[in-house]
């Protein structure tokens, strides 16, 4: 049975880079942001509930209006809870189905910016936090999303703080542009295999 890791971090922290490097090293990673979009696009119940909540225009020409949904979601914590309450239960079930086909592997991952807030942390065995300084995160996100600093800061304020996430994490990866990532990821994999060995020993005893 595979050990499941949850990869999280704030906007612009570099979660996707870490997930990609893990995949290169043979660890498949469920990208919850991408997979949730697929679930939303194909689940008629979600489509109806989002239309009832946000308005029919949230699906423009049959496709999800991601900008409108994001604007609604980040407008308040109440809006975020409403949207997440519709989407997250289906994504959890989708992840369970995905991971059930990978039981023969040692390690699999799930990447989510809101791993802890969404309750996805309950689906994994340990949390990996990707940390980057706030200024660098804002710079990366502004460049990537073609958004203003204020828009990015609004999103950051809507999420759990880095300090809280680090406290919950079993392992922290520093992605500040100076500390090399690959040695840290190799250290993470070694840490996970130690955990696997411990779990196997405990089970055999």
Swiss-Prot record:
Disulfide bonds: none
Name of the protein in its database record: Dephospho-CoA kinase
Family stated for the protein in its record: Belongs to the CoaE family.
Species the sequence originates in: Bacteroides fragilis (strain ATCC 25285 / DSM 2151 / CCUG 4856 / JCM 11019 / LMG 10263 / NCTC 9343 / Onslow / VPI 2553 / EN-2)
NCBIfam families to which the protein is assigned, alphabetical: dephospho-CoA kinase
Described purpose of this protein according to its UniProt entry: Catalyzes the phosphorylation of the 3'-hydroxyl group of dephosphocoenzyme A to form coenzyme A.
Annotated GO CC locations: cytoplasm
Keywords: ATP-binding, Coenzyme A biosynthesis, Cytoplasm, Kinase, Nucleotide-binding, Transferase
The UniProt record lists the keyword tRNA processing: no
Chief location bin: cytoplasm
Pathway: Cofactor biosynthesis; coenzyme A biosynthesis; CoA from (R)-pantothenate: step 5/5
């Amino acid at each position: 049975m595979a050990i499941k890791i949850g990869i999280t971090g704030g906007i612009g922290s570099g979660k996707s880079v870490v997930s990609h490097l893990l995949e290169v090293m043979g660890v498949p990673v469920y990208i919850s942001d991408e997979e949730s979009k697929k679930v939303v696009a194909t689940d008629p119940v979600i489509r109806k509930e989002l239309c009832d909540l946000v308005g029919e225009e949230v699906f423009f020409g049959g496709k999800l209006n991601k900008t409108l949904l994001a604007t609604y979601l980040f407008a308040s914590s109440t809006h975020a809870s409403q949207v997440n309450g519709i989407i997250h239960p289906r994504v959890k079930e989708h992840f369970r189905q995905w991971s059930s086909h990978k039981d023969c592997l040692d390690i699999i991952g799930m990447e989510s910016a809101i791993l802890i807030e969404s309750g996805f942390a309950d689906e994994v065995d340990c949390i990996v936090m990707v940390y980057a300084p706030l200024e660098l995160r804002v710079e990366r996100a502004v460049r990537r999303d073609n958004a203003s600093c204020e828009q990015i800061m609004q999103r950051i304020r809507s999420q759990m703080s880095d300090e809280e996430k680090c406290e919950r994490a079993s392992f922290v990866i520093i992605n500040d542009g100076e500390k090399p990532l690959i040695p840290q990821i190799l250290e993470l994999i070694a840490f996970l295999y130690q955990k696997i060995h411990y779990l196997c020993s405990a089970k055999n005893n």
